[in-house]
């Protein structure tokens, strides 16, 4: 009987961690904050349960990054959310983000699952964000490591993607399993990317990416990309980037 009670107590202690939790609460930004928030940043709001980014991006304005970070720190998890962007728009989901003031941007530490209007690969001139984003697309037309569903500049999506049109809702399901070194992405219930989180395959992709060329990016400051993907535990992040972006039905579940 004593052993049975101990087992029940163990299950009771573990179960809350394994439940799906909504990340949009009270129709507000409760549970979220701006990257390195100084009380002056703006651009995100919640309307009717929809999380909205609606401002000129920091990339375009030169203002400090206003990406949105979770208050809670995560390690291994699965997350599901619906998203939509405007024509030519660009956003992203990051994990493992560290908020030390030594970093100027969340993407200095956090890998990114790319969200972008895929039609800009057919008409690059339609991409929002000026020459920087235009050159990103033009330099990636073949490899598609910055395409919709890519782990940005590391792993291209697989197979034929079938996103809903720009302006309609799409769904991402993302699993980050640090314990088993596995990442997975589904677009509208179809697996489009599977990738490691460390190890030889990751290292090989990293060596070929811009993240291995820190000296070419002095605007990042002293830390550059030296700590990229080094933090297994970190905040999750929705990116401040060109174009309006909308997110709803954001749910997360810790794996362990």
Residue map of PLM features:
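Sec-dependent N-terminal signal peptides
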Residues: 3-12
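Carbohydrate-interacting regions of secretory-pathway proteins
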Residues: 13-256
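A general lysine-centric signal
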Residues: 2-3, 248
């Amino acid at each position: 009987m004593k052993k049975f009670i101990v087992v029940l107590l163990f299950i009771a202690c573990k179960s809350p961690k394994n439940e799906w939790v909504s990340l949009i609460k009270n129709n507000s930004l409760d549970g979220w904050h701006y990257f390195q928030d100084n009380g002056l940043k703006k651009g995100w709001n919640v309307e009717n349960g929809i999380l909205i980014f609606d401002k000129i991006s920091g990339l375009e304005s030169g203002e400090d990054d206003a990406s949105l970070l979770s208050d809670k720190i995560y390690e291994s998890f699965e997350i599901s959310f619906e998203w939509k962007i405007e024509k030519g728009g660009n956003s992203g989901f990051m994990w493992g983000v560290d908020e030390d003031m030594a970093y100027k941007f969340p993407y200095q530490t956090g890998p990114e699952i790319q969200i972008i209007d895929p039609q800009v690969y057919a008409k690059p001139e339609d991409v929002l964000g000026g020459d920087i984003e235009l050159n990103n697309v033009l330099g990636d037309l073949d490899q598609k490591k910055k395409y919709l569903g890519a782990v940005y500049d590391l792993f291209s999506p697989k197979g034929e993607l079938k996103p809903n049109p720009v302006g309609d809702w799409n769904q991402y399901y993302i699993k980050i399993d640090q314990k088993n070194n596995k990442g997975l992405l589904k677009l509208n219930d179809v697996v489009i990317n599977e990738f490691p989180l460390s190890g030889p395959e990751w290292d090989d992709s990293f060596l070929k990416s811009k993240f291995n060329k820190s000296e070419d990016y002095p605007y990042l400051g002293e830390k550059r990309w030296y700590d990229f993907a080094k933090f297994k535990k970190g905040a999750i992040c929705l990116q401040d980037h060109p174009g309006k972006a909308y997110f709803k039905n954001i749910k997360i579940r810790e794996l362990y």
